[in-house]
């Protein structure tokens, strides 16, 4: 192979790589930061026990799901289940303090997922204090310029 052909192949390869990096599916730093902000908004609403703020975090779609660390069933659908889950949880737990650590954020520009851990300090109505170490996966969907939660799955780490 002569030098001219090698240069043409190299130029084609670099052009392809540059275009692939700018494709719609490539992760954009602005999307990553926006997903992290949406993720933190969820935890702010949770720790504040604020149903109105929680409503603003979720997509109002029939396919959203919520599995809390103490859930016995899967809440499917925003209007039918998820919107009702949070007021009940806030009523059952007069104290909620949750901190989140992000391990990974991934997005294709339309869907994003955040994997990490939570430490939940809870107090029940009866006064019982609970501390849960949790593995969490949160999935977000982009609607317009907002990232809205479509799935929250929190799994207690066995002791």
Model-predicted segments: where are they?
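Short, low-complexity N-terminal intrinsically disordered segments enriched in polar/charged residues
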Residues: 2-4, 8-60, 80
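A short, structured loop/turn motif at beta-sheet edges
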Residues: 105-112, 125-128, 140-146
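A solvent-exposed, acidic/Ser-Thr-rich amphipathic alpha-helical stretch
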Residues: 29-37, 51-107, 131-132
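Hydrophobic/aromatic beta-strand elements that line small-molecule binding cavities or substrate pockets
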Residues: 85-86, 100-105, 118-120, 135-141, ...
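Short beta-strand edge/turn micro-motifs at domain boundaries
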Residues: 113, 133-158
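Short, well-ordered beta-strand segments in beta-rich or mixed alpha/beta enzyme
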Residues: 65-68, 111-122
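Generic C-terminal helix-cap and adjacent flexible tail
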Residues: 28-29, 157-159
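Sequence/structural signature of outer-membrane beta-barrel proteins
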Residues: 121-123, 158-159
């Amino acid at each position: 192979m002569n030098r001219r052909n090698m240069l043409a192949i190299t130029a084609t390869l670099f052009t392809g790589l540059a275009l692939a990096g700018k494709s719609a599916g490539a992760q954009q730093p602005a999307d990553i930061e926006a997903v992290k902000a949406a993720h933190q908004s969820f935890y702010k609403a949770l720790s504040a026990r604020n149903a109105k703020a929680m409503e603003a975090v979720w997509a109002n779609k029939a396919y959203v799901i919520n599995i809390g660390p103490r859930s016995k069933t899967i809440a499917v659908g925003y209007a039918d289940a998820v919107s009702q889950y949070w007021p009940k949880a806030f009523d059952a737990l007069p104290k909620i303090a949750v901190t989140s650590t992000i391990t990974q954020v991934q997005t294709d520009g339309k869907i994003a997922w955040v994997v990490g851990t939570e430490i939940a300090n809870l107090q029940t109505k009866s006064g019982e204090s609970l501390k849960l170490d949790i593995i969490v996966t949160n999935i977000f969907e982009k609607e317009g310029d907002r990232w809205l939660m479509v799935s929250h799955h929190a799994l207690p780490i066995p002791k």
